[in-house]
A protein has these predicted regions:
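Helix N-cap motif at beta-to-alpha junctions
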Residues: 59-64, 103-107, 166
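Core RNA-modification/binding signature centered on pseudouridine synthases
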Residues: 4, 122-241
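Flexible helix-coil linker/hinge segments at domain or subdomain boundaries
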Residues: 24-27, 66
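Short, charge-patterned binding micro-sites
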Residues: 26-58
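N-terminal ordered "arm"
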Residues: 1-25
Length: 241
């Protein structure tokens, strides 16, 4: 499966596996430190093997079974062809978790936030400014679905976004939040208050928020979500309202 990798490519693959496994590997001294790992004789390209060895020096003891287990868990059982499309072209479904922290004395309700998002969806998009350019966030194209639930406190809501991304555009959660905030004030986005892309937004009805991208997945020809690693399925559940 990997016989067409050159020796240096094999070395780099093993080094990445060790890092993913979280093993406490040692590094060499000198001007250009690197992982202290030694390999047996190199194989010619095109020659496969079922018995390869390497020495890995570590800074602390790790039991043999644990080390092998962590290495195995960090090793993908697949080879990705170099002609495979770039991840930016493959990963077209992205999920976000947004924690909304509201004013404890006068919090907006989940129903109000939901109504604001639904109003924006009905308008199909959000016009906003980014620097000197005017842009539009196409919600028909980028917002697949969402789920809004109560958080741990009355002034905390959790917004889950299921989004689509490609060369035509991708979701910008901060633009969606900024436009929803304007609606929650009883104003019209882009008319009574401009929507400007400035990274983290300074909102009125939302004291603060935290955005976390929680998953990235591919879509197959039938629209099913799959992992970019062909032999694995992706634990990504789309969120719908």
């Amino acid at each position: 499966r990997l016989k067409y990798l050159g020796h240096l490519e094999v070395i780099h693959t093993i080094e990445r596996i060790v890092r993913r496994a979280g093993l406490p590997y040692a590094v060499t001294q000198g001007f250009s430190p690197h992982m202290r790992v030694g390999f047996s004789s190199a194989l010619p390209v095109g020659t496969s093997s079922t018995c390869e060895w390497y020495d890995l020096f570590m800074t602390e003891f790790v039991a043999l079974d644990e080390a092998f287990g962590r290495l195995a868990a960090a090793s993908q059982a697949a080879y990705i062809d170099v002609r495979t499309p770039a991840l930016t072209a493959q990963l077209t479904r992205l999920s976000y978790r947004i924690d909304l922290h509201l004013d404890a004395e006068a919090p907006v309700s989940a129903d109000e936030v939901r109504a604001a998002i639904d109003t924006l969806r009905a308008g199909h998009g959000i016009d906003y400014a980014r620097g000197k350019k005017s842009k539009r966030l196409d919600l028909d194209h980028t917002l697949v679905g969402y789920e809004l639930t109560a958080g741990e406190r009355p002034d905390h809501l959790v917004l889950m976004l299921d989004t689509h991304a490609d060369n035509e555009g991708s979701m910008r959660p901060e633009i969606l939040l900024s436009a929803a905030d304007v609606l929650l004030q009883g104003l019209t986005p882009g008319v009574d208050a401009p929507i400007v892309s400035t990274g983290m937004q300074d909102l009125v009805t939302i004291c603060s928020y935290d955005v976390e991208r929680q998953n990235q997945a591919c879509e197959d020809d039938e629209g099913r979500l799959v992992s970019p690693i062909p032999v694995r399925t992706c634990g990504f559940a789309p969120h719908t309202r």
